Structure formats: structure tokens, C-alpha cells
Amino acid sequence: GNATGPLRWNHILNERLFSNTSLVLSNYDYEFGLGMGEDGIAVQSVIRDVNVKQDFSYYLNNDNTLKLGFNVIHHTLEPGNLDAGNNTGLSNREADQKYGFENAVYVQNQQQLTPKLNANYGLRVSHFSQVGSGTKYTFDNDGNLLTSEDFEAGERIADYLQWEPRLSLNYAVNEMSAL
């Protein structure tokens, strides 16, 4: 089944600075099956995450609220286990677990420009790292295997870095509507 276990701690550090710390454990379990018993097959995938998040809100003045923080997630994936009945002609298969770390830092300002116009702007930098143990395969455009490289537990297989600028505007048409 699916489960989530959050822990959260909010703290007012002073009259202008607010902290929100979170730890979230999650388990997503997906299963798909066809047939029953000896004639059936089932495919199961699992995603388990450990997520630590720290957010700060700093109230600069009546018109500006600075928000900043970071997030670290450890992913454990079981991408697909096959449980085949004896009469299917298929063999049971357990896929190798995959592991990754997802990290991010951000800073943004919520600014009231006029009584009806607000702006949110900032920058988020995200990084994903796939780690071993595992094997990295490289294929050509026709799907033929070119190379394979083995990685030990905890060794980096691939890294991805992304800069994510943020900008949004909100115009209050009236008390009930905004653009």
C-alpha cells in the first residue's frame, strides 16, 4: 500500500524570521496484474523517498517577504518486478533497485508593487544525482548496445543541474478575482 509519514516543526525565530522544517517519509507501491493464479502475471513498482526540507520566511518590510530554503530527497526505486504464474511461460524477474538524490536551493521575493499588483520573483537551483550500485548502458540510435559501465554502491552514475528562474505577477481585479 501507499503511506506517508510527515514530521514538521515551525518556529518563530524573531519578529521578522519564521522557520519551517519538514521530514517526510513516503512509500508508493504500484501493482498491475492480469489473470489469476497460475495463469496470471503481476508487475509491481515501488518508490520510497526520504525528504528533508528547510524553509525560511523573512519579512523585510510591509511590501517584501523574502523566502529561501533547501530540499534534499533520497529516492529508492524498484522499477518493476514481474511475478508470473507457472502457466504463463514467463519467468519471474526482479529489477535492480535504483537510487538517487534530488537537491535544491531557492530564494524568492514576494513584493507588493501597488495595492492591486504583486510580484513573485526568484531563482531555484536543482540537482539530481543517480547513484550506484548499478550498470549504465549506452545505446546507438538503432538500439544496439555500445558500452556498459558498472558502478559501486554510492558511486555517482549521472548528474543533472538545472537553473530555474521564477517570475509571476498577480493583479487583483476586485476582492473576488485576480489575473
Identify the function of each model-found stretch:
Residues T65-N174:
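Signature of Gram-negative outer-membrane beta-barrel scaffolds
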